[in-house]
């Protein structure tokens, strides 16, 4: 359990995370924060068609794993049952066969899944989620990558407390006729609401989803500045989402 916790910390991107220890992200909301968005028709699905899961068996450009590489993986781990333990088999294989290289967030959006597979290297949660979701898709699990920002970070960044960035990238997986949330370290939420952008974490650091797609190129992230701009936009409008914060309290399993 200790190893899994450390690994999860390593995947919390980008450079450093400046945050306060708070049991409730709303503790920061003692003043009025801005909202400059039209919330009347705000789309929390981010264009994902959840009622048509088969669409997410088709990879994006970045996540199109070579058949040869997938065949190598099948030789090692075999075929997988359409179950959560089957999904976790891929996470376990990834965690034991890829090496983490700390690039300080500079590799976000830079490599395709094939380039990452060839080097057996990942640079943080963006590349980890890309590898895992791409492989799961080849095994027949529809997958969607989600990009999130720390709610605590959004307040701190707006207040000028930090200039660094804090968030996380994970995967939504369709299995047994429902969408679950999968972290890169193999922990997961089975009772998951894919239309709620707020995500409660094990350590009470709430996350807020701001982008989704088949891979990060699919939702427009080609370099670190794309992620930074999306996060800054969330921070600049954090007051729009007060009613969503702490709206769910997930139980994480492994």
Language-model regions, residue ranges each:
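Short N-terminal edge-element motif at the start of the domain
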Residues: 100-103, 108-122, 126-147, 151-152
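Hydrophobic/aromatic-rich core segments of domains that either
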Residues: 130-214
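Sec-dependent N-terminal signal peptides
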Residues: 6-14
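Bacterial Sec-dependent N-terminal signal peptides
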Residues: 17-35
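Alpha-helical and coiled-coil interaction segments, frequently adjacent to or embedded
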Residues: 192-194, 199-254
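Positively charged n-region of N-terminal signal peptides that target proteins for export
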Residues: 1-5
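Secondary-structure boundary elements
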Residues: 35-123
